């Protein structure tokens, strides 16, 4: 199997999440095609891993890729926030957790679910087919204000009102059914000088729809807390984000973990014990090198943040 996706910040992840013992367990909570996991299992021969993904089709590709590692890798099909929340009691606590929040290139190129605005694929965007709403459901049913708010809040699209207005106008004649149809509508909705920028004018709207369909920003705070709670003492948690909405949430959560007191400001006496839960290992987000960006342009948006869970067992 030839992988479609190129994993970002690979060397940086391997260094920041280096095992500190031979029996360490690595959990890739966003397995995708398995690029990060393959690199960890190759670099660290004593490491065992669990790969989690909500998309059965891409997990099958990962299973094929990681077959040479045999029993060193186990797989779980489902959302990673739910996996960590219901972490099996008979599993050892993970020492290393990596969460790459980006969408795999597989979904744009091979999934057939309308993630790419240049395709005639059905406008779906669900990572898991059991989800209730597809992108087409949202585009064809939301009123103009709600649609504009969604595009602005999840896509940070400055022309969200114009785009929503054009969508509502066009769907009155015929419902949207494929991705290219929607992309062409967005292209016509925005000012001419916006049509030929660094990114396609539909990029941010498609991002917003994908986030809404899969509940990505709603899941993220739950995912962070659930993953950190099962992490072994001295374990490391790494997050790769690709847009500012995600990165702000991760940055704030890690900052809270590093605080020596988490009591409300109006509380006169500290009740939390006055000890930080984690050490932030990346004072600033780690970015891709110029060389990586040259070889893999999508990596230009990637940001890696890592924390270490402080071990108070012997203090």
Curated annotation (Swiss-Prot):
It holds the Pfam family Methyltransf_5. It catalyses: cytidine(1402) in 16S rRNA + S-adenosyl-L-methionine = N(4)-methylcytidine(1402) in 16S rRNA + S-adenosyl-L-homocysteine + H(+). One of its GO terms (biological process) is rRNA base methylation. GO terms for molecular function: rRNA (cytosine-N4-)-methyltransferase activity. The keyword Transferase applies. InterPro entries: RsmH, SAM-dep_MeTrfase_MraW_recog, SAM-dependent_MTases_sf. Gene3D superfamilies: Putative methyltransferase TM0872, insert domain, Vaccinia Virus protein VP39. Its EC number is 2.1.1.199. The keyword Transport does not apply. One of its GO terms (cellular component) is cytoplasm. Keywords: Cytoplasm, Methyltransferase, rRNA processing, S-adenosyl-L-methionine, Transferase. Its main location: cytoplasm. S-adenosyl-L-methionine binds at residues 34-36, 53, 100, 107. It is found in: Cytoplasm. Belongs to the methyltransferase superfamily. RsmH family. Specifically methylates the N4 position of cytidine in position 1402 (C1402) of 16S rRNA. This is Ribosomal RNA small subunit methyltransferase H. It comes from Treponema denticola (strain ATCC 35405 / DSM 14222 / CIP 103919 / JCM 8153 / KCTC 15104).
């Amino acid at each position: 199997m030839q992988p479609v996706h190129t994993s970002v910040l690979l060397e940086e992840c391997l260094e920041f999440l280096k095992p500190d013992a031979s029996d360490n367990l690595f959990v890739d909570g966003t397995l995708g095609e398995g690029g990060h996991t393959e690199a960890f299992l190759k670099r660290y021969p004593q490491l065992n891993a669990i790969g989690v993904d909500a998309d059965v089709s891409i997990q099958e590709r990962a299973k094929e890729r990681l077959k040479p590692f045999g029993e060193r890798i186990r797989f779980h099909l489902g959302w990673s926030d739910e996996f960590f929340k219901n972490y099996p009691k008979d599993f050892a606590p993970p020492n290393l957790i990596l969460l790459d929040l980006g969408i795999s290139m597989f979904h744009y190129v091979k999934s057939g679910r309308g993630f790419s605005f240049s395709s005639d694929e059905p406008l779906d965007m669900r990572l898991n087919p059991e989800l209730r709403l597809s992108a087409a459901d949202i585009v064809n049913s939301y009123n103009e204000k709600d649609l504009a708010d969604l595009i602005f809040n999840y896509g940070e699209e400055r022309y969200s009102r114009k785009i929503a207005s054009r969508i509502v106008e066009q769907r009155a004649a015929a419902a949207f059914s494929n991705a290219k149809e929607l992309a062409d509508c967005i292209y016509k909705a925005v000012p001419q000088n916006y049509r030929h920028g660094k990114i396609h004018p539909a990029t941010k709207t498609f991002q917003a729809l994908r986030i809404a369909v899969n509940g990505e920003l709603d899941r993220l705070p739950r995912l962070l807390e659930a993953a950190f709670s099962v992490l072994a003492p001295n374990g490391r948690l790494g997050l790769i984000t690709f847009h500012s909405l995600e990165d702000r949430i991760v940055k704030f959560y890690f900052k809270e973990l590093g605080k020596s007191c988490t009591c409300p400001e109006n509380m006169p006496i500290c009740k939390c014990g006055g000890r930080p839960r984690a050490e932030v290992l990346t004072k600033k987000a780690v970015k891709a090198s110029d060389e990586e960006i040259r070889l893999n342009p999508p990596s230009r948006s990637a940001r890696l943040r890592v924390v270490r869970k402080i071990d108070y067992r012997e203090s």
